[in-house]
From Swiss-Prot:
This protein's encoding gene: dnaK
Species the sequence originates in: Mycoplasma mobile (strain ATCC 43663 / 163K / NCTC 11711) (Mesomycoplasma mobile)
PROSITE patterns: HSP70_1 (PS00297), HSP70_2 (PS00329), HSP70_3 (PS01036)
PANTHER family for this protein: HEAT SHOCK PROTEIN 70KDA (PTHR19375)
HAMAP family, alphabetized: DnaK
Induction pattern: By stress conditions e.g. heat shock.
Name the UniProt record assigns to this protein: Chaperone protein DnaK
Organism taxonomic ancestry: Bacteria, Bacillati, Mycoplasmatota, Mycoplasmoidales, Metamycoplasmataceae
Function: Acts as a chaperone.
InterPro entries: ATPase_NBD, Chaperone_DnaK, Heat_shock_70_CS, HSP70_C_sf, HSP70_peptide-bd_sf, Hsp_70_fam
Single GO molecular function: ATP-dependent protein folding chaperone
Residue numbers spanned by region Disordered: 570-601
């Protein structure tokens, strides 16, 4: 009987990737668009849920589109769509379900199990939320592993006979982690981990966005930050500019008709130099330096002890990031693996280990933060120190703080601060029925255990009566079992109907994007367009709208193929006439263009 496959999923802030091991060789699975990475974006349109490339294209036009939901995992925040509130786990489940569906089509069999990666610095609530998202998507999450650990697995799969110490620098879309691992005799042991859950490639994009907002305000006296659609376009162009500046010294940012004011349309055309980009983001690069030093210190290593420095996450392509790291560690980072795919590949390898397809690899991960309980005076008393190898169990005896105390409250905290209030409370429970006695007399054993997924269980036992109270620390904001079951059932019920809707959604989105472009051109440039062309275009818009209303998808596809190229030429012609007019003065003369170099540009 064939072993059941376990896929590996990198559920990223910006993009997600799914991989599998076939014949002991990792394979990244392409999505329906032929891409190996899928945007972690979900869009709601009427009753339809759209994920990935098509959803990302709607960021500009559809306010019911959600990106970077990973930043909210493990929190009580919700997103409101059409009068319904969704928890982060639900949105993430939609992404996971999409990945699962196309993976099944690629390998030709059902998938029930997955290994999902999380940032090393994800706390317990965030890990539980990730497991919950997997369950809603119909996946049994066999293991949650840290992203840097997964990267090291991918790098070291064919090097298990060599003893090496590896530093993994993982700069994702929304999180940043550094881990130090030791590889020896097929064992991958995490020695330390450090990072920042609120730093990622998005922050580099945002610096460009802020720069553009300032330029537009200065030149056009318009605050574009209050225009949602314009901001979506700015963010998309900022990301493109960041990517371009990794390989070129200068990039152009062109945003025609970004907005329309009383003075006319705002057209943005600026150049951004890599040197200026590096100045505006230098503070972000510097924020990554301390976690690198902390991880080495925790591992009791120096930079010269490292054999390899691995780069993970698309933003590690930024030259300033690589230069800082090389200068800090006096070692050139390893570029041999694709930073966008390596985490999913590592997760797939761990899946193969769990399924028995790989037998000579052992992964020993660590807990990223100290765990303890609140004791008298609000002190955080640690039981399991950060960077302890998991799974692990630790017990300690405590007592009462007052005479004749019959009940104690156990407040479980996570963090490195001395006072419990300064750390994150993961949950609390009461142990009652304690026999009356002077303070300090009763013996209460508190035990912590952390499993391989980093999920925590805590128990308190009265040693005299053997009365015990146990809690599994779960995300205090997570969904109830009933809610999770309902969502799983709903997802299964709607699966066939959703599949039938997919083609309709893709074609309709294409059509509506085209309509928006044409209507905007007519609205902004109508007086400059030939009346016959304008009339013909308006008729075509009406025809397309009618086909959408009548659900005539096949006819709509044919119509779109015919008109898209015509529409492009139509928009270019209108823009050309506007440019010609703007270059003329009122007396009919045309000024020569004079460029003045802006030292801040």
């Amino acid at each position: 009987m064939a072993k059941e496959k376990i896929i590996g999923i990198d559920l990223g802030t910006t993009n997600s990737v799914v991989a599998i091991l076939e014949d002991k060789t990792p394979r990244v699975l392409e999505n329906p668009n032929g891409k190996r990475t899928t945007p972690s974006v979900v869009s709601f349109k009427n009753d339809d849920i759209i994920v990935g490339e098509v959803a990302k294209r709607q960021l500009e036009t559809n306010i019911n589109t959600i990106a970077s939901i990973k930043r909210k995992m493990g929190t009580s925040e919700t997103v409101k769509i059409n009068d319904k509130e969704y928890k982060p786990e639900e949105i993430s489940a939609m992404i996971l379900s999409y990945l699962k569906d196309y993976a099944e089509k690629k390998i030709g069999s059902k998938i029930k199990k997955a290994v999902i990666t999380v940032p090393a610095y994800f706390n317990n609530a965030q890990r539980e939320a990730t497991k919950t998202a997997g369950r809603i998507a119909g996946l049994s999450v066999e293991r949650i592993i840290n992203e840097p650990t997964a990267a090291a697995l991918a790098f070291g799969l064919d090097k298990t006979d060599k003893e090496q110490k590896i530093l993994v620098y993982d700069l994702g879309g929304g999180t940043f982690d550094v881990s130090v691992l030791e590889l020896a005799n097929g064992t991958f042991e995490v020695l330390s981990t450090s990072g920042d859950n609120f730093l990622g490639g998005d922050d580099w994009d945002n610096e460009i966005v802020k720069w553009l907002i300032g330029k537009i305000k200065l030149e056009h006296k318009y605050d574009v930050s209050k225009d949602k659609m314009a901001m979506a376009r700015l963010k998309e162009e900022a990301e493109k500019a960041k990517i371009n500046l990794s390989t070129t010294s200068t990039t152009s940012i062109n945003l025609p008709f970004l907005a329309v004011t009383d003075s006319g349309p705002i057209n943005v055309e600026v150049e951004l130099k890599r040197s200026d980009f590096e100045k505006m983001t230098q503070h972000l690069v510097e924020r990554t330096r301390k976690p690198v030093r902390d991880a080495l210190k925790e591992a009791k290593l120096k930079s010269e002890d490292l054999h390899e420095v691995l780069l993970v996450g698309g933003s590690t392509r930024i030259p300033a990031v690589q230069e800082m790291l090389q200068h800090e560690l006096n070692k050139k980072p390893n570029h041999s693996i694709n930073p966008d795919e390596v985490v999913a590949i590592g997760a797939a390898i761990q899946g193969a280990v769990l399924s028995g397809d790989i037998n000579d690899v052992l992964l020993l991960d660590v807990t990223p933060l100290t765990l303890g309980i609140e004791t008298q005076g609000g002190i955080a008393t640690p039981l399991i120190q950060r960077n302890t190898t998991i799974p692990t169990t630790k017990s300690q005896i405590f007592s009462t703080a007052a005479d004749n105390q019959s009940e104690v409250t156990i407040n479980v905290v996570q963090g490195e601060r001395q006072m419990a209030a300064d750390n994150k409370s993961l949950g609390q429970f009461n142990l009652g029925g304690i026999e009356k006695a002077p303070r300090g007399t009763p013996q209460i054993e508190v035990s912590f255990s952390i499993d391989v997924n980093g999920i925590i269980k805590v128990s308190a036992t009265d040693k005299k009566t053997n009365k015990i109270q146990t809690i599994t620390i779960e995300n205090s904001t997570s969904l109830t079992e009933e809610e999770i079951k309902k969502m799983i059932d709903d997802a299964e019920k709607n699966k066939e109907a959703d599949a039938k809707k997919k083609e309709k959604i893709d074609v309709t989105v294409r059509a509506e994007t085209l309509i928006n472009q044409l209507e905007k051109t007519i609205k902004d440039q109508g007086d400059k367009i030939d009346p016959k062309e304008k009339e013909q275009t308006e008729k075509e818009i009406t025809n397309i709208k009618d086909l959408i209303l009548q659900d005539k998808i096949d006819e709509l596809k044919i119509k779109l193929d015919q008109i898209e190229e015509v529409a492009k030429a139509f928009a270019q012609k209108a823009a050309s006439k506007e440019t010609s007019k703007n270059e003329q003065n009122e007396d009919g003369s045309i000024d020569a263009e004079i460029k003045e170099e802006d030292p801040k540009a």
